[in-house]
């Protein structure tokens, strides 16, 4: 499983994206879904596909968004070997 995590500079995104911050996040989600990524929380997306070429393609697609490079503060990708969801334990 791979993950992509990013942080946008809100002021830069508001200035660079023609439709604003909410649409910027929607565009990112749409772009990453094309490569099998699912939003887990905030700006963290994961993908079950173990092909690193898919990961690189997703990042390149984000880079191709005209407003993204000038709006992103940080973007990281990493492999998740084990994933445990403790939500139901905490909520019970």
Curated annotation (Swiss-Prot):
It is an enzyme of class 3 (hydrolase). The keyword Nuclease applies. One of its GO terms (molecular function) is nuclease activity. Gene3D superfamilies: 3.30.70.240. Its EC number is 3.1.-.-. It holds the Pfam family CRISPR_Cas2. Signal peptide: none annotated. Keywords: Hydrolase, Nuclease, Plasmid, Virulence. Belongs to the VapD ribonuclease family. Cleaves ssRNA, mostly between U:A. Homodimer. This is Endoribonuclease VapD homolog. It comes from Neisseria gonorrhoeae.
């Amino acid at each position: 499983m791979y993950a992509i995590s990013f942080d946008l500079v809100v002021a830069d995104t508001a200035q660079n994206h023609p439709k604003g911050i909410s649409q910027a996040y929607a565009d990112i989600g749409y772009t990453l879904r094309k490569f099998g990524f699912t939003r887990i929380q905030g700006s963290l997306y994961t993908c079950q596909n173990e092909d690193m070429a898919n990961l690189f393609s997703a990042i390149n697609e984000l880079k191709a968004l005209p407003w993204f490079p000038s709006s992103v503060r940080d973007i990281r990708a990493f492999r998740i070997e084990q994933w445990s969801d403790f939500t139901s334990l905490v909520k019970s």
